[in-house]
Amino acid sequence: AAAMDFSHWINLKVILEELQLRGHEITVLVPSPSLLLDHTKIPFNVEVLQLQVTKETLMEELNTVLYMSSFELPTLSWWKVLGKMVEMGKQFSKNLRRVCDSAITNKELLDRLKAAKFDICLADPLAFCGELVAELLNIPFVYSFRFSIGNIIERSCAGLPTPSSYVPGSTSGLTDNMSFVQRLKNWLLYLMNDMMFSHFMLSEWDEYYSKVLGRRTTICEIMGKAEMWLIRSYWDFEFPRPFLPNFEYVGGLHCKPAKPLPEELEEFVQSSGNDGVVVFTLGSMIQNLTEERSNLIASALAQIPQKVLWRYTGKKPATLGPNTRLFEWIPQNDLLGHPKTRAFITHGGTNGLYEAIYHGVPMVGIPLFGDQPDNIARVKAKGAAVDVDLRIMTTSSLLKALKDVINNPSYKENAMKLSRIHHDQPLKPLDRAVFWIEFVMRHKGARHLRVAAHDLTWFQYYSLDVVVFLLTCVATIIFLAKKCCLFFYRRFCKTGNKRKRE
């Protein structure tokens, strides 16, 4: 398995642990350094990829991307957004190239991996190179991820049908019920991502993959060989859309029943009485906020009767109320599953959102970047959440959102409806993910699920050759009909006129 950081690793680790329980031997390729991954604590065989970069440099780059995505991009014109995205894409590609080089150029590592005779490779399509390693080892591979920006990888490399008229592009924050202007925005988002991905990222990686494999190929061709695509979503909060046989929703695979809280934490929760508690976290990637924003948030939290558990490692806000307690870490799943939890204030990360759905907890969303605006847009459309824009948020707007979610019973009812749908599945998400991985291992692939779209050129895929042929036929018929009419007109009409004159 090729590991990525943060939520990507959290989900992959759950799958790997289940596979290990079923008797499979696991080896994980881990870059060093990593921001969240500690390769000394990973309970599997580990191959560390040594990089010539420090953890501090990675954190600095991450903070720059987070700030730009959360606060700069929403204020820029679309052409400036395109420029910034190209800039971030190139930096992201540079980081991926470092990791890939450390694996591909390590002959001893590749020899060990070949000698191990693995049955399958689990990879993340956002971390280029997992599929290249699988190709070099001549083994099938399965992808696990949430989505790519604008669904560009799924559309271009997997052939996933994505009509822009009702399938909102990822990171757009749109729903499936779009106005004309929103459909225009969605169409332009797809176009912009196609241009950026094709012209500023793919060409470089096409050349790299061709050089490594010793034959002319493209990264999309190699990605398209994925046997299964395990997507961290599900129909409980996803909008209906076309799908492919080798795509499977496994959202919430990490969710589980709540465990009892530590004694001190349980005492704090019980002290809330009938008012209950609110759980607040902006995830593992946001370590702190500006003093102004943290005081604004603390002031709003101080005005609700509920007790608040706030995961926050920044400076203690001056406006922090007696009902609010700060924690460096909280047992989030166990708190969301507690009967006294009334609401969840979240950035909208997929993992936390699915834990809230699993336990039926309504949400106040403060989306920042990546998949978060999309996630919050979905649960908001389902009536289980309200959203607040961190850039323009005020104490009163956050307070109003909290009171609405806590006091309006419809939010809780809709959250419970999503929870019931999530639990009413023929197979649990984790079991479904493991089933398909083992299916690919048993059958050495799943090519019978692979659509023929991979074998078509782009103009064949859109039937443009058929359209051109039909238009040519119509034009030919019109041309011949016109010529025939002119011929008969000249042959008979002019002859008749000539006889009359005689």
Curated annotation (Swiss-Prot):
Coarse class of the primary localization is membrane
Any one biological process term the GO annotation gives: lipid metabolic process
Gene3D superfamilies in UniProt: Glycogen Phosphorylase B (3.40.50.2000)
Signal sequence residues = none
Intrachain S-S bonds: none
Which positions, given as ranges, span the membrane? 466-481
Q: Where in the cell is it found?
A: Microsome membrane; Endoplasmic reticulum membrane
What's its job? UDPGT is of major importance in the conjugation and subsequent elimination of potentially toxic xenobiotics and endogenous compounds.
Question: This protein is called what?
Answer: UDP-glucuronosyltransferase 2C1
Native organism: Oryctolagus cuniculus
